Swiss-Prot record:
GO cellular component entries: extracellular region
UniProt protein name: Toxin To29
Tissue: Expressed by the venom gland.
Ranges annotated as spanning the membrane: none
UniProt entry keywords in alphabetical sequence: Secreted, Toxin
Length: 8
């Protein structure tokens, strides 16, 4: 996903 890690 893209939110806390900006890459997941």
């Amino acid at each position: 996903f893209n939110g806390a890690v900006x890459i997941w």
